[in-house]
């Protein structure tokens, strides 16, 4: 958003077609730049060696002197995953987040980055002043504690960035939405509401489909033998549900991987998880039929740990036909193909595979009724659907129009587009900032350009032929060879004529 008393919003990521993940929104108020979230997304094609994708932040580098900070809504990778890459380029940029959000971010930072990082812990409902502008975080319900939305107060009105949220009256403590604070902000006047679109096509409220304790209970009851359960480390609510249900049985949970163990222990110490430690087993319990083995997924390679176990590479766990493999999350955008392949591989081993259905079980994102409630609380003059694919954003726009926001006050944008406001009114801005995406290869830890990807694609489709020989340096006579080496071209034993 640009004000003259100006502000603009530029979606460097998360604002265009096929854009689940890599969220990054820039709000520029009289040259004061506020960045909301900086996340990654996964490559859904399972090829070309790409681990994950982040937004191009050349614009931020160019304008780094004007950046007031990066404001993180919560600790999921779609919202914090690009921060380490930004800090590589702009080490001093202030990063604001709640206690747990910053703890999750610290896990992604290299030791040298952590020393230099300018991390600023915030508390919900405590205003942060930046001259004539200010930021006010409000607690919201998501699958991780300490999630917030942000209200950016400007001279011409408030911009509200919801982040990811649901309305669920059963949630308490660090998961609870402060509806009173949201309503108070709405009464003061909201110029523009930026609301997520992930489930905008789904009717009703997301709750109670975001809670799966009953399904976990059913899996535990129907499968008396050993269960190997995958869990996303940042989905604290699901981890809590798992521990709650296991504690009602005679089973023990064995937590595999030091990273997951450390995270759970720290979360328990900080009060974000409640765990009966007598239910936590050790490696000696791995072979017991009534054990639940908890394994985590890694950032760069979803299902990587489970894949290692399936292929027999794991030192401690070998899958048996009596085992049940329990995928505790519905496949989210970006990993659908990999999830389907994993389920096939489990079936080939003869083990039982159980997963959450994306039709019956929902993630903690706002459905249509949640969006309607948020819009009614905020009563914004302008509405800006963000996150999700374009069809989700279009559905979100329809929700807003359905409850009374004029069509001309609903903003649909592509990555790099600018929504400009002058003295509180949306202008017909044609400005566009050139942005693209950065493809990260975990091996090289750098941006993989289009030319490299094209070469990889050609090699994958056509193979390679290498001709080598040894030459005399002075006479250029052939001393040895030539030798022909092929990979992925033809099967040599059956192609002697060639």
Identify the residue ranges that each predicted region occupies:
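His/Asp/Glu-rich metal-coordinating catalytic cores
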Residues: 1-71, 76-285, 304-318, 337-340
């Amino acid at each position: 958003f640009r004000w003259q008393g100006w502000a603009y919003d530029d979606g460097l990521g998360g604002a265009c077609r096929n854009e689940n993940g890599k969220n990054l929104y820039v709000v520029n108020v009289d040259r004061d730049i506020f960045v909301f979230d900086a996340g990654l997304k996964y490559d859904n094609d399972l090829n070309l060696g790409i681990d994950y994708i982040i937004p191009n932040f050349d614009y931020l580098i160019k304008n780094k002197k004007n950046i007031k900070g990066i404001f993180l809504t919560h600790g999921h990778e779609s919202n914090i995953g690009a921060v380490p890459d930004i800090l590589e380029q702009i080490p001093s940029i202030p990063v604001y987040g709640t206690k747990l959000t910053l703890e999750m971010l610290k896990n992604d930072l290299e030791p040298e980055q952590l020393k230099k990082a300018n991390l600023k812990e915030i508390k919900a409902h405590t205003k942060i002043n930046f001259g004539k502008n200010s930021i006010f975080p409000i607690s919201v319900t998501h699958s991780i504690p300490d999630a917030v939305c942000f209200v950016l107060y400007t001279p011409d009105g408030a911009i509200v960035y919801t982040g990811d949220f649901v309305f669920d009256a059963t949630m308490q403590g660090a998961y609870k939405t402060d509806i009173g604070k949201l309503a108070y902000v709405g009464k003061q006047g909201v110029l523009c509401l930026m609301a997520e679109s992930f489930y905008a096509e789904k009717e009703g409220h997301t709750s109670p489909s975001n809670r799966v304790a009953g399904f976990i209970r059913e899996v535990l009851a129907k499968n008396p033998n050993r269960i190997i359960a995958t869990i996303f480390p940042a989905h604290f609510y699901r981890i809590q549900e798992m521990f709650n249900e296991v504690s009602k049985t005679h089973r023990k949970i064995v937590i595999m991987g030091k990273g997951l163990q450390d995270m759970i222990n720290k979360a328990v110490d900080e009060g974000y998880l409640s765990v009966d430690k007598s239910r936590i087993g050790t490696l000696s319990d791995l072979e017991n039929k009534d054990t639940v083995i908890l394994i985590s997924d890694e950032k760069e390679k979803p299902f990587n740990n489970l894949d290692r176990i399936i292929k027999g590479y794991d030192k401690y766990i070998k899958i048996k036909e009596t085992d049940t493999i329990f995928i505790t999350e519905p496949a989210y955008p970006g990993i659908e193909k990999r999830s389907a392949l994993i389920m096939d591989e489990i079936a080939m081993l003869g083990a039982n595979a159980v997963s959450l259905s994306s039709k019956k079980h929902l993630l903690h994102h706002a459905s249509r009724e949640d969006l309607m409630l948020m819009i009614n609380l905020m009563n914004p003059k302008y509405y800006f659907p963000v996150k999700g694919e374009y069809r989700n954003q279009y559905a979100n726009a329809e929700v807003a129009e359905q409850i009374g926001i004029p069509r001309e006050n609903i903003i649909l944008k592509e990555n790099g587009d600018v929504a400009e406001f002058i003295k509180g009114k949306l202008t017909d801005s044609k400005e566009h900032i050139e942005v693209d995406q950065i493809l990260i290869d975990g091996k090289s830890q750098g941006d993989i350009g289009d030319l490299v990807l094209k070469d990889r694609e050609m090699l994958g489709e056509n193979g390679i032929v290498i001709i080598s020989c040894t030459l005399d340096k002075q006479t250029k006579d052939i001393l040895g060879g030539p030798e022909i080496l092929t990979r992925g071209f033809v099967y040599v034993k059956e192609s002697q004529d060639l």
